[in-house]
């Protein structure tokens, strides 16, 4: 998740009827690979997570992962996803050549073991351009590299990148946009310092998504725009004019998630399903729509 003082984004998936996802689009959560106690999730942990979000009855059908090899994410999450009917947006870390190689190897191993039907799409990197951890040119090369690898097994797999709104509308990064089948955008009005009431009234989130969509389509008309993260914390420190709170999360979710998941042509992932007690800083522990014991903080309207 990024922290930056600028208008940020969100947009996502789908509904034919309330709680029913439209075929071809994905609706779910971005989820880390660590349990509440900080240990790596086991296959059983992933299965419980997936069963829980499906049990909420809102048509959640996908989860975004941040890594392939770290915490043996794919080795544990893929069997659990197959068992529960969840599709995975696979994250592949792009920085550090050795790490990138390990991520590719883990993804390839999972494909050889399980095929490709469990894959929603693949994101090479996450907010690397925002952090300036990699050059746009090198990142584009890595996207082409991963696409070439996975399309030996399924020529229709979509490969892209996840980054902040400001990164996607920055022309210096257009080489990455041109390399992507999907441009996955993250957006947090909270980290812009906008209070939830204003963010809802001014459509901060929606306007920034539309800005991303406009720029991406001008650069690469074939690229789809998905949402990787948005959310609101329920505890922790305020950020400028934005304060955490369960009511703020409930209102923001009702406005943004329900707008997002009514879109028939956009897949999207909320940050996040469950609180993460070992995250830092303190406010990062509290972005779940449910607590660390998987109990919802409010009744989900969509």
Put a short name on every predicted segment.
Residues 84, 120, 126, 163-207, ...:
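Aromatic- and acid-rich polysaccharide-binding/catalytic face
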Residues 150-169, 218-230, 265-278:
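Aromatic-lined carbohydrate-recognition surfaces of secreted/lumenal glycan-active proteins
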Residues 27-31, 61-65, 86-91, 120-124, ...:
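Hydrophobic faces of well-ordered beta-strands that scaffold small-molecule active sites
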Residues 75-158:
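Substrate-binding cleft of extracellular glycoside hydrolase catalytic domains
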Residues 26-110:
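N-terminal carbohydrate-binding/catalytic regions of secreted carbohydrate-active enzymes
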Residues 1-23:
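Fungal secretory targeting signals
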Residues 34, 238-246, 260-302:
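Aromatic-rich peripheral "rim/lid" segments of glycoside hydrolase catalytic domains that contact
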Residues 32-34, 66-68, 93-97, 124-129, ...:
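Active-site beta-loop-alpha junctions enriched in small/polar residues
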């Amino acid at each position: 998740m990024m922290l930056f003082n600028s208008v940020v984004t969100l947009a996502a998936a789908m509904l034919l009827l309330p709680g029913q996802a439209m075929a071809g689009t994905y609706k779910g959560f971005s989820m880390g690979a660590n349990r509440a106690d900080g240990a790596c999730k086991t296959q059983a942990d992933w299965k419980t997570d997936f069963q829980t979000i499906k049990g909420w009855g809102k048509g959640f059908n996908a989860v975004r992962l941040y890594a392939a090899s770290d915490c043996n994410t794919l080795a544990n999450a893929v069997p659990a996803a197959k068992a529960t009917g969840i599709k995975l947006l696979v994250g592949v870390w792009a920085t550090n050549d050795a790490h990138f190689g390990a991520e590719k190897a883990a993804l390839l191993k999972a494909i050889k073991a399980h095929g490709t039907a469990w894959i929603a799409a693949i994101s090479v990197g996450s907010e690397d351009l925002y952090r300036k951890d990699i050059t746009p040119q090198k990142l584009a090369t890595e996207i082409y590299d991963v696409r070439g690898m996975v399309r030996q097994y399924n020529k229709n797999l979509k490969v892209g990148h996840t980054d902040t709104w400001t990164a996607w509308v920055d022309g210096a990064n257009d080489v990455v946009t041109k390399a992507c089948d999907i441009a996955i955008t993250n957006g947090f009005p909270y980290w812009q310092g906008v209070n939830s009431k204003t963010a809802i009234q001014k459509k901060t989130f929606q306007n920034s998504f539309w800005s991303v969509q406009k720029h991406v389509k001008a650069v690469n008309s074939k690229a789809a725009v998905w949402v990787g993260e948005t959310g609101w914390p329920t505890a922790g420190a305020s950020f400028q004019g934005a304060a955490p709170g369960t009511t703020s999360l409930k209102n923001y979710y009702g406005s943004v998630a329900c707008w997002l998941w009514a879109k028939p042509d956009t897949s999207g992932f909320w940050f996040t399903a469950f609180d993460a007690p070992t995250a830092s800083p303190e406010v990062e522990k509290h972005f779940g729509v449910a607590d660390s014991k998987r109990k919802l903080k409010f009744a989900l309207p969509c």
